Amino acid sequence: KFDPHKPYVLVTTGGGGDGATLIDWVLRAYEHYKRLDIQALLVLGPFMQSKLQSGFMSRVSRVDAVHAITFDSHMEALFEHASRVVAMGGYNTFCEVLSFDKPCVIVPRTVPRLEQFIRAKRAEELGLSSMLLDDDERRPEDMAHAIEGLEHQAPPSAIHIPGLLDGLSTINAVVDRWASEP
């Protein structure tokens, strides 16, 4: 049974439509490496095919440290209580990682677009998160190592980047300037 009061790694695929690879990789890490003792909460996403969801739920039922849900309308609470995050790196998820200040490993999608890869690469260069690239081998030990590494990874707030989360105040300043023009 999942205990939200104990440390956990939140694994999120965003909508889930293309998240099966990430979920499978994390599950294989837990299936092969019992030393991964931090519990994992997998959020499959509402757009993941139901056949894939069923298969993952079946596998999850055999791994004590892993729990899965399809969707939660209060993802913010899951982020808030998570101690670590593994995600694909979509824009909204990345903003939540920054806002909730969570150590994160991003496993970006590279097909059909490089958007997540570009975001993950730059975030890693800045020290905001780490990145694990899908090399098509998806070795369980690579994912296990990435999850374990999050324990020693600083949260994004440890890196001071002026203006990083100042979008709202910047927009307000621009609107105020426009509003004061004759």
Enumerate the predicted regions with their spans.
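Hydrophobic residues at beta-strand termini and immediately following loops
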Residues: 69, 107, 132-133
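C-terminal amphipathic helix plus adjacent low-complexity
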Residues: 142-182
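A donor-sugar binding/catalytic signature common to diverse glycosyltransferases
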Residues: 74-118
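Class I S-adenosyl-L-methionine
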Residues: 53-61, 121-125, 148
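Donor-nucleotide binding loops and adjacent catalytic segments primarily
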Residues: 2-84, 136
